[in-house]
């Protein structure tokens, strides 16, 4: 060992008690500073108390954890939306104005359905008429429909998934996109960097070589703390073809979604396909995420065509960049609006106190409340937490069902006989406060009847 290194080592050894003490004092000062941050910024009192106690009691462990998971807002995204390209803001204003002027349901939607006005405020977009929505039950039906649409694409394809795997389905999906790219179709692909963590470099390189613009959704830091943030994930699932068809719902791209998982099979999930003006809202949601990641705005088709089915649809994006807890409020409003029926299906049923109280109040009103959760779990801790909420909601009027026919992953609400909620959001804290989600709200009796028929079948495979 060189002489100078020996001297430094000896100096550290001689003063190590003082250095350890000084380090601990600095850590405690940082912990106290973060306690103030937690109290000021946590969205719930429970979260503020939990972080504060843990930071003071175990600073060595909890300080790094808070820096990675404790921030309540996706500040980089928030700043980008507020200070971003003026062209994006102008485009969003134009699209929303067109929806209001040309495609809003006749009359005031809030006059006979007060929830409609509330949901529009949460979405910052209006319900649109002239839509046609079809259920896609499970993976085979969903991906057959998506692949058919991709094969017919003429101009562009927008793709966004939380999970994109390099397995049989993922490779087939890649091949379909590469074929259309070779035909001159523009393809824009987003995947979440954590959800798609195992995606191989070879897979990504093949996409880029084919001319497909593929980017990973990850925290784009605006400061040092932002570099440590991994807690905010983009959980949305979107495929838009030529601005004419949008596929939205609960399925990602992986073999398990086709029932090929060794343990979680068959896989029960729900997606839907939309045609009509609501497709423009799905495009706008995709474009905001794309612009935040790439600072680019691809030219898209914003000419909507109405469909004979004339369904009323709202596409409602939610996420940690919102000014309020939009996803939680959406669920609370849906539950509070129920007059005769409230059927909830969620793979992760870990609601917070406001949602639990809303469910109990619905039961007290005499609403037929049914909650379907998985019998087979992909995450044991989450399942046990869900069962704890089942026990807590053990009151007359709330019926819980456990799905027995494989793994249940769909996220569906059926309210009364005319309103459905289908999308990517779970009834848990991640969806309420941490994930970017997307839910399609359809107000149409015929479509609600289809959803009812689907859920009755699911209840028949439950106990």
Which residues are covered by each model-predicted region?
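Active-site-proximal loop->helix
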Residues: 383-384
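N-terminal localization/anchoring segments of enzymes in phospholipid and broader phosphate metabolism
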Residues: 1-329, 333, 337, 377, ...
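Helical hairpin unit composed of two closely spaced alpha helices linked by a short loop
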Residues: 348-370, 374-375, 379
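Thr-Gly-centered strand-to-loop micro-motif
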Residues: 345-346, 403, 422-423
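Catalytic-core elements of nucleic-acid end-processing and repair enzymes
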Residues: 411
């Amino acid at each position: 060992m060189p002489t100078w290194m020996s001297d430094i080592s000896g100096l550290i050894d001689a003063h190590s008690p003082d250095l350890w003490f000084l380090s601990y004092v600095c850590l405690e000062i940082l912990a106290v500073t973060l306690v103030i941050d937690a109290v000021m910024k946590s969205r719930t009192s429970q979260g503020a108390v939990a972080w504060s106690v843990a930071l003071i009691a175990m600073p060595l462990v909890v300080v790094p954890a808070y820096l990675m998971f404790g921030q309540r807002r996706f500040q980089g995204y928030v700043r980008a939306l507020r200070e971003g390209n003026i062209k994006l803001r102008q485009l969003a204003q134009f699209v929303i104005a067109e929806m209001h002027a040309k495609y809003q349901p006749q009359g005031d939607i809030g006059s006979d359905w007060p929830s409609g006005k509330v949901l529009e405020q949460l979405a910052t977009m209006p319900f649109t008429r002239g839509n046609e929505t079809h259920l896609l039950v499970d993976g085979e039906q969903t991906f057959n429909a998506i692949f058919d649409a991709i094969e017919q694409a003429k101009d562009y394809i927008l793709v966004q998934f939380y999970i994109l795997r390099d397995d049989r389905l993922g490779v087939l999906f890649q091949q379909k996109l590469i074929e259309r790219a070779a035909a001159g179709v523009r393809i824009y692909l987003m995947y979440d960097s954590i959800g798609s963590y195992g995606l191989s470099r070879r897979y990504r390189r093949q996409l880029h070589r084919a001319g497909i613009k593929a980017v990973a959704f990850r925290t784009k830091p605006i400061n040092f703390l932002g570099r440590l943030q991994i807690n905010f994930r983009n959980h949305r699932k979107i495929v838009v073809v030529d601005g004419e068809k949008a596929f939205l719902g609960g399925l990602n791209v992986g073999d398990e979604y086709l029932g090929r998982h060794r343990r979680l099979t068959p896989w029960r999930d729900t997606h839907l396909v939309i045609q009509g003006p609501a497709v423009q809202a799905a495009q706008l949601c995709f474009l905001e995420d794309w612009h935040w990641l790439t600072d680019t705005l691809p030219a898209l088709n914003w000419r909507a065509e109405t469909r004979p089915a004339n369904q009323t649809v709202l596409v409602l994006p939610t996420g940690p960049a919102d000014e309020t807890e939009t996803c939680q409020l959406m669920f609370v409003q849906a539950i509070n609006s129920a007059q005769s029926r409230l059927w909830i299906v969620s793979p992760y049923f870990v609601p917070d106190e406001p949602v639990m109280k809303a469910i109990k109040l619905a039961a007290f009103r005499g609403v037929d409340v049914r909650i379907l959760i998985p019998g087979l779990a992909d995450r044991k801790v989450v399942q046990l937490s869900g069962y704890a909420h089942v026990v807590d909601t053990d009151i007359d009027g709330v019926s819980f069902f456990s799905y027995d026919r494989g793994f249940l992953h769909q996220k569906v609400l059926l309210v009364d006989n005319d309103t459905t909620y289908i999308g990517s959001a779970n009834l848990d804290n991640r969806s309420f406060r941490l994930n970017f989600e997307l839910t399609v709200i359809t107000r149409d009796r015929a479509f609600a009847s289809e959803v009812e028929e689907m859920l009755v079948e699911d209840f028949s495979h439950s106990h």
